[in-house]
Amino acid sequence: MPYLASLARQCTRFADWTESDTGQASATQYVSQFQGDSNHTVRNDCAPSPTCQSTADNLFRQARTAGLTAVNYVEGATTACSSSGNATKHVPAMYFKGADDAAHCAEQVQPYKNFDINHLPNFAFVTPTMCNDGHDCSNTVVDAWVATNVGAVLNSATYAQGRTLVEIWYDEAHPVPNLYIAPTAYTGSVATPVTYRSTLRLWQDSLGLGCLSGSCGSTNLRPLAGT
C-alpha cells in the first residue's frame, strides 16, 4: 500500500496498540471505543435492538451536550440514521440508545456523501464500505480509497489551518494498525503501550470534554502524537 506507507513516514504511529476487548467482535470494539468501557449487551456483531444496544454515556452524547457536533459518516448509506449499504457493526453511533441518543440519530449518523471538507463537524468518524476498509477487497483497493478520500482532506484549506487531526486505524489485531496525521504531529513510531480508550481520551481532550470510565485512566495520546 504505497500511499499509506508514504503517510506512515510523515506521521505518528503507535507500535504497541492493544485491543480494549481482546477477542471480541467488531461491534463490541466500536461501542466500547466510544463509551470508554466494555459493553456487555453488544455481542457477536448483533444488529441494534432492545437486547443489543448501549445506554451508557458516550462521545456522541458528550459532544452534543457540550454544544458540539459529532457525526458518524457511513459510506454506502443513502439516508440518515441508516447503515444500509454498509455493515452496521462498523457504525457505532447506531448502537447508542440511552438518554436522548435515539432522538438525535438522524443528525449523528449521516451518509458519507454529506461529508464536506469545507464544513466539517467538530468530530467526524467515517465508516468506509466493507470493500474500501479491506474486509472484502484487496489492499490495492484500500490504498486507492485512502489516497482519494484522505488525500482530499490533507490537501484541503481546512487541514492547512492546522486544527484538524486525521486518524486511520483498524478495529482488531495486535498491534492495531494506526496512523495519526496532523500538521503538528510528530514523525515516527511511539513505543508507549496504548489502547482504543487512549484514543477516546485524545478525542475528549481535543474537544474539551471530560473523560468517560476507562478513558480516565488511559494514556492520553495527544502529547505523545504532538496533536
Language-model features: where?
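Flexible, surface-exposed loop/gating regions in the mature catalytic domains
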Residues: 1-227
